[in-house]
Amino acid sequence: MKKYIVALDQGTTSSRAIIFDKEQNIIGVSQKEFNQIYPREGWVEHDPMEIWATQYSVLQEVMAKCNITQENIAAIGITNQRETTIVWDKNTGVPIYNAIVWQCRRTADICDDLKERDGLVDYIRENTGLVLDAYFSGTKIKWILDNVEGAREKAEKGELLFGTVDSWLVWKLTNGKVHVTDYTNASRTMIFNIKNLEWDERMLKELDIPRSMLPEVKNSSEIYGYANLGAKGGIRVPIAGIAGDQQAALFGQAAFNKGDVKNTYGTGCFLLMNTGEELVKSKSGLLTTIAIGLHGKVQYALEGSVFVGGAVIQWLRDELRIISDSSDTEYFATKVEDNGGVYVVPAFVGLGAPYWDMYARGTIVGLTRGTNRNHIIRASLESIAYQTRDVLEAMINDVGYDINCIKVDGGASRNNFLMQFQSDLVGKKVIKPIITETTALGAAYLAGLAVGYWSDKEEIAKLWFASEEFEPNISEERRNKYYKKWKKAIERSKEWAIED
């Protein structure tokens, strides 16, 4: 049997390639950052060719670094930033515009117009599981077709293709032979029906998107096509797993059972609860999404997306310049007994779940003459935990049962102050896995299952072990007192950007 699986992890700020062996040991990692493009306030773009160049180069680099040839790779799995939208020319393979990133708010006006259409908000919620928001791919596709010269005409002639980042990478890896996505990524577009598992005709009509642009939707674990990683005529490696980053992390955490919850602390924060084969409609502002698609069947999940999680730490470092390194936050946060009454609401691009307020903006409240740098840093870290509690409360309200623990991963999960505060604030155990690269691991698992590298989910579940556990150690009364103040701070940030 071939020895290794390669996971391509295409994220919001960097492209990574990670090689795993059968015992899920990490053999090698390569990573390259790429440019963030901000053409106007609230707009965020990436260059699709730079995404591809960085992703392919880290793949080559990690193989060379570990002295591994393609003969030893059983399969490639792909996980990606979701919702980010790329439209390219079918014949030349050249993108007609930059990738519009999930964080980008440029289509807020389109969303406002769509909200006026009879019954559309409810239809979207009922059939796509999503809320009508600029976050998702549908309105981004419409914007490109409406604003790039000649785009709509080319699309009508069947000359343009749309894809989320996974589709783009598969297209490039297979030299334009394969145009696919998986159920998890499709479920984030706002044009995919999560009940009948097909592109939704009404949504395509409402957004005026030709069906010919869309990729074929496949399972999250199957062979989609082959990549040639060496010289022409060399051994072809199967591309055999695809999942959006948050669903991949859920799978990588072995959260296979109904009621399992994970939170990924990345640029944003993403809480997912596996609801099994039950499609739970949220009453609390959460998304209903597809957790995974295997063997033509799907498991569903409830998701709460927090737009600014770890990004608040980047803001402290890059814009306020009150820390020089992200890891400094833990040190400074513990230099004060508490937040000094200061609350930071990092609604830089609006508020995600459960509020869905595109016009909210960041606020710092509770400042006094005695407030110092440490209070601001601590309150910024705490904001990540508060937003997580907002989402967790909504989830428990929707499903009608409690949970025992949260499995955590992502960059900010390395911050022990934050993890302890998180446990204190929600009153649940917080568990870190030994392998924290759960997103890449999920993609590796999916690819490995498709080619028989791992036999089944049961084998994978036995590989999952906890590295650290955090138990709550504050009273219920104190927990609720903190949270009440947070809710007050949230109210201050809402609807700030609405013009009077």
UniProtKB/Swiss-Prot annotation:
Residue numbers binding ADP: T12, R16, T267, G310, G411, N415
Gene Ontology BP term (one): glycerol catabolic process
Binding-site list for sn-glycerol 3-phosphate: T12, R82, E83, Y135, D245
Record EC number: 2.7.1.30
Pathways per UniProt: Polyol metabolism; glycerol degradation via glycerol kinase pathway; sn-glycerol 3-phosphate from glycerol: step 1/1
PANTHER family in alphabetical order: GLYCEROL KINASE, SUGAR KINASE
NCBIfam families according to UniProt: glycerol_kin, PRK00047.1
Protein name, as recorded: Glycerol kinase
The species this protein was found in: Clostridium perfringens (strain SM101 / Type A)
